[in-house]
Amino acid sequence: MSQLGNICHADYMSTSTESQERSLNNPNDTHPEIVNVVSTFQLGVKLELRKIVQKARNAEYNPKRFAGAIMRISSPKSTALIFQTGKIVCTGTRSIEESKIASKKYAKIIKKIGYPIHYSNFNVQNIVGSCDVKFQIALRTLVDSYLAFCQYEPEVFPGLVYRMASPKVTLLVFSTGKVVLTGAKDEESLNLAYKNIYPILLANRKEDISNQ
């Protein structure tokens, strides 16, 4: 959640009125872009974190601030949170495949330091996506219509929080049309959540509401 503010934007080019209307009514014309994948995996061995940061590049360990060591690599760009138990959390990649590649690179680095690792249990814990529906949304009207699923406190946070039951994904919806999706474990769930929310957002399009 801490990285949700770093939302990627998609290029948009103005087209004819006909194509714009077609896009508004077809969620397949846009889709969420993955901006962060969080995964976990195990190395099957206890780790001495001070030893790791002494021998590895781009690694730090301050137990007064955080219980794990932090390591970064540039390709694929990512950050690993390394714990004494041998559990590692990988974050910052833009796809599941990148996350797998990064996790194996971290495992290889620790193996080279001298640990008899056993790489296992790679699991995606969270996929964060973002998109822009290209129209403004009447958040107050939306929350009134879907009160059971929504939380909206504009004095605390400018976005509406929509908790979808199936798939189990949380969406942050902004009046500008920006949408952030979090909690998906696979791309299918991410895209399905967007497909489900799109007609709801379209029904609460600010221009349409104001003309009623």
UniProtKB/Swiss-Prot annotation:
First and last residues of every Sequence repeat: 30-114, 120-201
GO molecular function, one term: RNA polymerase II general transcription initiation factor activity
InterPro entries: TBP, TBP_CS, TBP_dom_sf, TBP_eukaryotic
UniProt main location, coarse: nucleus
PROSITE patterns membership: TFIID (PS00351)
Source domain of life: Eukaryota
Record-level GO cellular component terms: nucleus
Disulfide bonding pattern of the chain: none
Subcellular location as annotated: Nucleus
GO biological process terms on file: DNA-templated transcription initiation; positive regulation of transcription initiation by RNA polymerase II; transcription by RNA polymerase II
One Pfam family cited in the UniProt record for this chain: TBP
Keywords carried by this UniProt record: DNA-binding, Nucleus, Repeat, Transcription, Transcription regulation
Function as written in the Swiss-Prot or TrEMBL entry: General transcription factor that functions at the core of the DNA-binding multiprotein factor TFIID. Binding of TFIID to the TATA box is the initial transcriptional step of the pre-initiation complex (PIC), playing a role in the activation of eukaryotic genes transcribed by RNA polymerase II.
HAMAP family for the chain: TATA_bind_prot_arch
Subunit structure of this chain's protein: Belongs to the TFIID complex together with the TBP-associated factors (TAFs). Binds DNA as monomer.
Family: Belongs to the TBP family.
UniProt name for this protein: TATA-box-binding protein 2
